[in-house]
């Protein structure tokens, strides 16, 4: 096939199959407008699951549509190396085997000792603060000592201290799952999320169990295991529904319930299910309105602003760039963490890129980079926008774009 772009390939293959844009869209659960934008190379197709559905309907292999998409996501960087990979390899090894085998031997009375809860609590809080600032290498480094200390403390603590230690251990594994997911080490993220669930259940804190399930759903989503991600989120939503609908629900319940509804909205948008995505956003917006303020229960950053930035992300996933940008103009994301602000700006950049507004897309990426350089240099969505902008610009990309591509190790 002579054409070099994805859009041209899709258009030619669609015509060969005798399909209209509307018919192709219906077959893959997307709109006619979405197909038109893809064929005109206005809208990039990033999701392997969507590429697979396109390929199935068009009767070709994914690599025939987009050869580079067949490569593993972790190979996104040209040299196969990710910043902080050595730290995360050590953290991955830490998750291998029993977390505190040495404490299973010896007299139980000898093992019991006083545990410094304030110090452990402060260290877990710091790990999450670093995560919210997208300083993932520092997160990984802190967890290399924190997780073993908490695992030992969970076995050494007095009965009165043990539930809180286990809750802290669950939070530590949750931040590990979050960091692994952002590093696209999703198999390790799943292991960390599973350990977070186990520690939370042992602590007796049901809401911590739900928070652990939320992290597991994030890992499934990144793996493109949409059915498993949806199942994990939906079961948790069902468990919280009665409490969330009560006259005076706990703020923590509303935060988790709303965050899970946002997760369902993103999952639906990723799968091209516009109706379900809108339903999830509406349910989350109702929970946020009842909450009345932005909070950070279980490190979810849930609140009205969080819902608004997710609405932008959902619109981008659905190919509704105009709606995404209209919504983005109404959002003051400064109340969110640097990580959330940067992800919001990446979504704004993606929306501009869908409309081939290269200058605006680059400005959004540079603003995101000023907040959290590590995120922009490693996040696959941000890097995809950089690559698209390089392709838009041809042989003479702007100096700022060339420099950003160099910092992120992105080639056309």
Report residues per predicted region:
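A short, Lys/Arg-rich alpha-helix, primarily the initiator
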Residues: 1-17
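Conserved binding/catalytic microenvironments
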Residues: 2, 112-412
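Conserved hydrophobic/aromatic packing and binding residues within compact polymer-binding modules
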Residues: 10, 21-25, 35-38, 65
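The alpha-helix within a helix-turn-helix
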Residues: 14, 25, 55
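DNA major-groove recognition helix of helix-turn-helix/homeodomain DNA-binding modules
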Residues: 29, 49-64
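Recognition helix of helix-turn-helix/homeodomain-like DNA-binding domains
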Residues: 29-45, 70
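Short C-terminal boundary/hinge segments that cap the last helix of small helical domains
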Residues: 59-74, 307
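Short, charged recognition helix plus adjacent turn
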Residues: 67-98
